[in-house]
Amino acid sequence: MQPGEYLIDQPTEAIAANLGRATCELLVAHTGDRPIQVGSHYHFFEVNRALVFDRGLAYGMHLNIPAGTAVRFEPGDSKIINLVAFAGTRQIYGHNGLVNGALDAVDQRQTSLNAVQQQQFGHRAQGDLE
């Protein structure tokens, strides 16, 4: 045994996470010239403006991947990603400043979508990307 080593029994069944939460699949296109990496719990609606996707569908969601992992987008990439709704208090602060408050507050979604347009974040309806 090494110092700090963990000895973990193998689970007898698969670990299930995010059960009962809303999910969606999005096609994301990277139009920039540098790789972009997005962490597991970043509010996907607010990711780099060079990623083009339906931000309205991504509002209030993060990547449906294990905590502490990330998805990398290379320049010119297009890929389908799976998102899951945030739980808890559903308050988002920081990131790119498009929400900075409660996701479910009156008019917050529309205010945030207006900010996407004003600040020229990549946004296209899902059907327009396919």
Swiss-Prot record:
Family matches, as InterPro entries: Urease_beta-like (IPR002019), Urease_betasu_sf (IPR036461), Urease_subunit (IPR050069)
Pfam families for the chain: Urease_beta
GO CC entries: urease complex
EC numbers: 3.5.1.5
Organism annotation: Herpetosiphon aurantiacus (strain ATCC 23779 / DSM 785 / 114-95)
Localisation per UniProt entry: Cytoplasm
UniProt entry keywords in alphabetical sequence: Cytoplasm, Hydrolase
Keyword Cytoplasm: yes
Pathway the protein contributes to: Nitrogen metabolism; urea degradation; CO(2) and NH(3) from urea (urease route): step 1/1
Coarse class of the protein's main subcellular location: cytoplasm
One Gene Ontology MF term: urease activity
Subunit structure: Heterotrimer of UreA (gamma), UreB (beta) and UreC (alpha) subunits. Three heterotrimers associate to form the active enzyme.
Protein name: Urease subunit beta
Catalysed reaction equations from the record: urea + 2 H2O + H(+) = hydrogencarbonate + 2 NH4(+)
Any GO BP annotation: urea catabolic process
PANTHER family: UREASE
